[in-house]
Amino acid sequence: FFKNREITKIDTLLSLTGFSLVGGPAYNSSKEAENALSLLGVPYLAAHAIEFQNLSQWAKSDGGLSPVETTILVALPELDGATNPTVFGGRLGEEGGCSCCSEKRNGKEKSYDMVPCFERVNSLAEKTYNLVKLRKREVADKKVGIILYGFPPNAGAIGTAAYLSVFHSLFNTLKAMK
């Protein structure tokens, strides 16, 4: 559907399902997702509407997403290769949703209705647009910041990570950008 013979017809794949690309909320097949994404060769972004709390509860929460939401809405899509997890909406709730959007509502929504957070939808659209723009920019014109992990500090552990060849990967990345 996203390809015309060998040519990919999309610049980015944006999933709004709130769970794994291949499977569902209770099952995922990261291998099948990896195969599909490899064939497309485009970035994969996953955004989601929160399900287990309403927008107002989420906005007021010190903890953000619940552990179940974090697993289903963030971790499973990331296993597939998704980036940029973003909340774009959720249930309105008795409080009327998020404070940034209450004036934009038509007043006909019920507390249990799923509604967008317009501010976050606009932010998601802007991030997606900028990612597409960045991918189309010449490699030599891209500006890249590199952060290397170093823990414990002052112990000569810069660039260490379990089961990862950090400097080899960094070298290959920089070489590809030359």
Regions found by a protein language model. Name each.
Residues F1-K178:
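An N-terminal assembly and electron-transfer interface module characteristic of large anaerobic redox
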